[in-house]
Amino acid sequence: MKILVLGCNGMAGHMISLYFTENGHDVTGFARNKSRFINTITGDARDVGLLKGIVRAGKYDAVINAIGILNSFAEDNKSTASFLNGYLPHFLADVTADMDTQVVHMSTDCVFSGKDGGYSEQSVPDGNTFYDRSKALGELNDGKNLTLRNSIIGPDIKQSGIGLLNWFMQQKGPVVNGYTGAIWTGQTTLQLAKTMENAIANHAHGLINAVPNSSITKYELLKLFNKYLRGSSLEINPVNGVCADKSLIRTNFDLNYNIPDYETMISELAEWMKIYKELYPHYDIQ
C-alpha cells in the first residue's frame, strides 16, 4: 500500500511510519523536519495549499493523520489547536472526497470527561478542556474514512515527549507511584500501527473505539512497563491520587480485528524497542 503519514516524527507517527515501512509498504512522511528513516516531505500542515497538492499528487491508498496539538499546548495555542485538531481531518476528507484515498484519523479517549466511564461510539463527548473539545470536533464518521478513537502509549524519539511511557522510562526510582483510580483503555503505538494496517487493507470506516475488551489502571500499566522494559528494577507503589475513568467500549465491529490484551501489547512493544534501541538513547531499556 502507498501511505502518507502526517506527523511522521511524533510519538505515534514515527512508530506508524517505521512499522509500515518494515512491512513492505511505500511510505512517505510529512513533518516540519526530515525523518531519520523514511522519505519525508517537509512543511507546515497549516499550509493548506501545500498539503492539498501533496495529497492530490500522491494518489495514496491512505493518508494517516498523526498530527495533534496536545493538552496544555492546546490551551495556550487555541487557534493552532482548533486548526490542527478540529479542522484538518475534515479538510483532508474534503480534499480526497473524489479520490480512492482514505483518511485515517487518530482520536482520543480525552473527548470524554472521565466522570462515568464505559463510553461507546454512541456516547456524546463531554470533555471539559479546549484540547478535549478540539479533538472531538475533528472526529470523522462517514462511509469512507476512518477514525480510530483510543488512548496510546509508546516510546518517543524526543526526550521531551509528554507520554506516560516516556515519563516512566526516565524515572530513576527506586519507587514510582502509579494511580489505582485512573482507568485506561487503549493501544501501544506499535499495536495501533498493526490495527491501522488491517483497517486500511479491509476498508474499515466510520468511528471505532479501537480498544481491547477490558480496561486497566495506570498502576497496572506501570507494573507491566517495569516488568518488560526495566527488568523489574523499580518498585511500583499504588496510590489513589487521580481518579478518572475514560474507559472506552467498542460496539462498532466494522473493523473485524481483535486487539490483544495489555500484557501482550506491552511485551511486543518491549521487543520492538530493544530491536530499535538506537532510536531511544534517552531510555534505560533492560
Name each model-derived stretch.
Residues 90-126:
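Conserved Rossmann-fold NAD(P)-dependent oxidoreductase catalytic core, especially the SDR/UDP-sugar
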Residues 260-286:
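Amphipathic terminal alpha-helices
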